[in-house]
A protein has these predicted regions:
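PRY/SPRY (B30.2) beta-sandwich protein-interaction domains
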Residues: 1-269
C-alpha cells in the first residue's frame, strides 16, 4: 500500500488496501522516506521538567524550580542557509522563551542556550512586555523588540557568511544597533544579530564541527513552545497562511528568505 499526498487513509497503490481511523485525529506530515525534517531530540536535553510531544516538535515545561529547560534538534549543519520557526504557545507572564543555535558543548556541559561562545540565542521576556535579549558566551545584549505567548519567531542562519537573523511574526527584527535584519545580504550581514563562529574551527574537537538548532525556556512555571522545521504545524495546529518558499522544501507560516531552505535530509543533501 502507499499513503501519500494528504490521502492519509486511502491506498494509492491501486490495490484498495484502505485504512480507517480507529480513534483521534490524524496530523498530516511532510516527512517521507526520502525527506525527513529535523525534530527536537529527546536524547539531547538538559535542566528543567521538560517533555516532548507531537512528533518531538513541542517542548512542554511543567512547574519546577527555576531552570533553563534546553533541548537541541536532531539535525546539524556546518554550511548552507537554513530557516525554521518557533511559536511561543502558552506560558506565564514571567516566562523567557528562547531559540537559537549551539554546538553540542552546551548540553554536554549542562549549560543553557547562549552560555557558551559558540551558542547564540534570543530570549523574549513576557513580563510587562519586557524587551528581548540575545546571549552568546553568557553575555546579554538587550534588543529593541519584545515577544510573548502567541508570537512566532523565525530563525535564519547563513552558515556560508556566518550570520544569524531573527524575525517576529514575519518581520525581520532589528539588532542592537537598530539595523533591520536582511538575511539575503550575504557577506555584508546587514542587521545580523551576531557574526557566528565558523564551525570548521571545532571540526576536530570533542564537540564536533557543526551547529544544532535549539530551543530553551526559563521560569518555574508551566509553558509550551513548538517548532516548525518544515512540516507546516505548530503542535497539531497547521500554519494559518503558508508563506512563500522558493526551495519547495517544507511549509512555513512566513516567507522563507531567498536562498534558504528547511533543515531536513533533502535540504542537507
Amino acid at each position: 500500500f502507499i499513503l501519500k499526498d494528504g490521502n492519509s487513509v486511502t491506498d494509492q497503490s491501486g490495490r484498495g488496501n484502505n485504512w480507517t481511523v480507529g480513534g483521534g485525529t490524524l496530523t498530516k506530515t511532510e516527512d517521507s522516506p526520502s525527506n525527513n525534517f529535523c525534530t527536537l531530540n529527546s536524547l539531547d536535553m538538559v535542566y528543567g521538567n521538560s517533555s516532548l510531544s507531537q512528533g518531538n516538535n513541542t517542548q512542554n515545561q511543567t512547574a519546577a524550580s527555576n531552570h533553563y529547560a534546553f533541548v537541541n534538534g536532531t539535525l546539524g549543519f556546518n554550511s548552507g542557509k537554513w530557516y525554521w520557526e518557533m511559536k511561543c504557545v502558552s506560558g506565564h507572564s514571567d516566562n523567557w522563551y528562547g531559540v537559537g543555535i549551539t554546538s553540542t558543548q552546551c548540553t554536554a556541559n549542562n549549560n543553557w542556550l547562549g552560555q557558551n561562545a559558540d551558542s547564540y540565542a534570543i530570549y523574549g521576556y513576557s513580563y510587562g512586555g519586557g524587551l528581548a535579549s540575545t546571549y552568546t558566551g553568557g553575555t546579554r545584549t538587550n534588543q529593541g523588540v519584545s515577544f510573548t505567548a502567541g508570537d512566532i519567531i523565525g530563525v535564519a542562519v547563513d552558515c556560508d557568511n556566518m550570520a544569524i537573523y531573527f524575525s517576529k511574526n514575519g518581520t525581520w527584527m532589528s539588532n542592537a544597533s537598530s539595523v533591520q535584519g536582511v538575511p539575503t545580504s550575504g557577506s555584508s550581514k546587514t542587521g545580523s544579530f551576531y557574526t557566528i563562529s565558523d564551525p570548521a574551527t571545532r571540526k576536530y574537537n570533542a564537540y564536533g564541527g557543526f551547529y544544532l538548532p535549539s530551543v530553551c525556556y526559563y521560569d518555574a512555571r508551566t509553558a509550551v513552545q513548538s517548532v516548525n522545521f518544515g512540516n507546516g504545524y505548530f503542535g497539531t495546529t497547521a500554519v494559518s497562511s503558508a508563506g512563500t518558499n522558493a526551495s519547495g522544501n517544507g511549509i512555513f507560516e512566513y516567507d522563507v528568505p531567498t536562498g534558504y531552505t528547511a533543515l531536513s535530509t533533502k535540504g542537507l543533501n
